[in-house]
Regions:
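Extended charged low-complexity segments that act as oligomerization/scaffolding linkers
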Residues: 1, 68-78, 87-100, 157-178, ...
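Walker A/P-loop-proximal flanking segment of P-loop NTPase domains
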Residues: 1-26, 112, 121
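Extended hydrophobic
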Residues: 44-46, 141-144, 149-151, 165-168, ...
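Conserved Walker B catalytic segment
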Residues: 100-135, 146-149
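Short loop/turn elements that form and flank the Walker-type P-loop nucleotide-binding site
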Residues: 22-23, 94-96, 126-129
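Post-nucleotide-binding-loop coupling segment downstream of the phosphate-binding loop, primarily
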Residues: 30-98, 110
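Conserved nucleotide-binding/hydrolysis micro-motifs of P-loop NTPases
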Residues: 62-64, 106, 137-142, 180-184
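Short secondary-structure boundary/capping segments
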Residues: 71-75, 115-119, 144-156, 238, ...
Length: 262
């Protein structure tokens, strides 16, 4: 994340707003590394709060246990030994829920156990008055955690495009797509524009995104990943277009070469 910089993700934001009134309790968001999941959840936290919806932002790698209810009681300084409906949570409704955003649940030391606990928690608090937006980093759908089909009613599915062989999470998850062309152009302007004075890292190459596209299309095509975009503009701050090496140039390779040379 770059402080003060967020590239709008219209489709994903619409999906995360439109499910607010759903009866389902789990919105499973997934994508590859560097796709902008954390930035998106931080933006949705802002949007939910702006709409008057109580929201809590948690990071998977900072849980003190693999029990969501215990974590909520600890973070909110609630009385231990009581159920949530005894602590005022019953006041939330399907239309005006408590929204819990959990970023990077896969980074928890016992991620599968945490995921199962979240499902059990939502099964216990059915009705849509408590909702969880859960992000999980994977490279392919085969790496997603498996949920029993008995949880189908609590897992939100915007579309039912999955094939019959897909399990519940595979067919229900929202896959955060790479940046589209307009978003890439906008992100380039955001990343290379006026920077926060507290941010000491330069991100202004001596060429435009359009010039890069004409120079090396395969290189510019990799910038649909927000993390690769950031690494690229930092590596080429104050520099001209990268020299052609013939063939495909990987931004990850360039980045690793830079680290080795330091």
């Amino acid at each position: 994340m770059i402080e003060g910089v967020y590239q709008e993700r219209q489709d994903a934001e619409v999906a995360l707003r439109s499910w607010i009134g759903a009866r389902a309790g789990l919105f499973f968001l997934t994508a590859e590394a560097g796709s902008g999941k954390t930035n998106l959840l931080a933006e949705m936290m802002r949007q939910y709060t702006e709409r008057g919806i109580d929201a809590i932002f948690l990071r998977g790698n900072r849980f003190n246990s693999n029990d969501l209810q215990e974590e909520l009681i600890s973070r909110l300084n609630l009385q231990k030994g009581l159920e949530l409906d005894q602590l005022g949570f019953i006041e939330y409704t399907q239309e005006n829920p408590l929204m819990i955003l959990i970023d990077g649940a896969n980074e928890h030391s016992a991620s599968v156990m945490l995921f199962e606990n979240i499902l059990q928690f939502l099964e216990k608090h059915k009705g849509g008055h408590i909702k969880v937006v859960l992000s999980w980093r994977v490279n392919t759908k085969s790496e997603l955690p498996i949920a029993d089909e008995k949880y189908q009613s609590i897992v939100y599915a915007e579309k039912t495009e999955g094939v019959s062989e897909d399990n519940l999470i595979q067919r229900s998850c929202y896959w955060l797509k790479p940046l589209n062309k307009k978003e890439v152009e906008s992100a380039w302007e955001l990343y290379t524009g006026n920077q926060n004075k507290k941010d000491k890292i330069g991100r202004k190459p001596n060429f435009t995104y359009e010039q890069l596209t004409y120079h090396d299309r395969s290189l510019s095509d990799q910038l649909d990943n927000p993390l690769l975009m950031r690494l690229f503009v930092e590596m080429f701050h104050g520099k001209g277009l990268p020299k052609s090496r013939g063939g495909f140039i990987s931004i990850w390779t360039l980045y690793h070469q830079k680290l080795i040379s330091q």
